[in-house]
Amino acid sequence: MSRVKRGVTARARHKKVLNQAKGYYGARSRVYRVAKQAVIKAGQYAYRDRKVKKRTFRSLWIVRINAAARQHDISYSQLINGLNKAGVELDRKALAELAVYNKDAFAAVVEKAKAALAYII
């Protein structure tokens, strides 16, 4: 069996990792052993934060909806309860968009929720 020299593949693998580590600070962008660890950790952070991003945006939407709802003398939880009772199927992203960019439409949605709450009581 003939001898296999691994220099080409090793260099390619190292180059790939060092390219992924471009822009990192100090040895993390220059030394293969450290860069490899940094790239792996960056991948773990990226994976985790793709999940966290969804939670963060949902909480941002809730904060925006709550702020806009309180301007109409109703709390966030009462608004959501009223919308559920009224059968309005707007998600929090859509409600937040209305609250920020279309205040008249949001006011109409709030009135619908208030009417549903008043009807039940």
Curated annotation (Swiss-Prot):
**Superkingdom classification of source:** Bacteria
UniProt GO molecular function: rRNA binding; structural constituent of ribosome
Report if keyword RNA-binding is assigned.
Answer: yes
Q: Which SUPFAM superfamilies match?
A: Ribosomal protein L20
A cellular component annotation (GO) from this entry? ribosome
One Pfam family of this chain: Ribosomal_L20
**What are the protein's UniProt keywords?**
Ribonucleoprotein, Ribosomal protein, RNA-binding, rRNA-binding
In its UniProt record, which GO terms are filed under biological process?
Answer: ribosomal large subunit assembly; translation
Protein task: Binds directly to 23S ribosomal RNA and is necessary for the in vitro assembly process of the 50S ribosomal subunit. It is not involved in the protein synthesizing functions of that subunit.
Per the record, the similarity remark reads:
Belongs to the bacterial ribosomal protein bL20 family.
NCBIfam families from the xrefs?
Answer: rplT_bact (TIGR01032)
Protein name per UniProt: Large ribosomal subunit protein bL20
What gene, per UniProt, encodes this protein? Answer: rplT
